């Protein structure tokens, strides 16, 4: 193993549930043979982590220090003896399990180098990779009507990619600031999703009773899934990009059958696909084809991470993505 410097302790966030998180010191771990240790610059706060912060009976508390952070980026400071494709000092994005911390260990195969062209940019690789993977599995082509339900970080970037592919994006959100962001990213139609029946009528005014060729559900709630089913046309593709974690869902299978829908769970779990998505996202950002910068709306010091989660829970006007400063 090669090590840059010698450090005895590091700092991490410890989640105890019921909106309680504290700062703890942890011993520095050494990477195994095919691992790297990264000195983190930052980590995105993922909406899927909100229930962990709020507290749920099915979670076991306290979480491991740094968990469930998984959107980290920073510089490699130690490598395992079988890692030959990466070097100490490389700036990387990664998928790792405990990135709400100053340091985390990642598998070498879950790490992507960040080019020098993005030296001054935050790069939360995991959600950026999710966007690209969702887009790939959505099979978007020019001229399609694409309804995107939920314009958060994922929904806004998916809007950009769909518009770039020549699709006509119908953006649906409860928040006016989210619809404004969708318009900035190229959406051709903006619809408030305060009432499901009203939203469905407005969409059908645009694309007719035949419905949309593609519907991307990016909320993770039952009502959004119900609306997605109503908007999808015959032989359409309904793409589930929202993270559903608070219990089983019910769907209108008769409608799905009658419409002949292709239903896609767009969350990749194959590590190789995770990495592929991150690599492609970083390339798109590096060339200017994708710009997430307007969505990085809040930066929070690690010691104040609870503030970031309160913002995520309340979603003040203009909020899209909070990044934790892990330095």
Model-predicted regions and their roles:
Residues 144-163:
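Glycine-rich adenosine-cofactor-binding loop
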Residues 27-44, 56-98, 117:
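Glycine-rich beta-strand-centered segment in the early N-terminal region that forms part
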Residues 231-248, 264:
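ADP-ribose/adenylate-binding Rossmann-like module
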Residues 200-201, 205, 209, 247-297, ...:
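C-terminal substrate-binding/catalytic core of Rossmann-like NAD(P)-dependent dehydrogenases/reductases
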Residues 2-8, 226-229, 234, 276-327:
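C-terminal hydrophobic helical "lid"/dimerization subdomain
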Residues 78, 92-149:
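NAD(P)H dinucleotide-binding glycine-rich loop of Rossmann-like/cofactor-binding domains
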Residues 148, 163-227:
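Adenosine-nucleotide cofactor-binding segment
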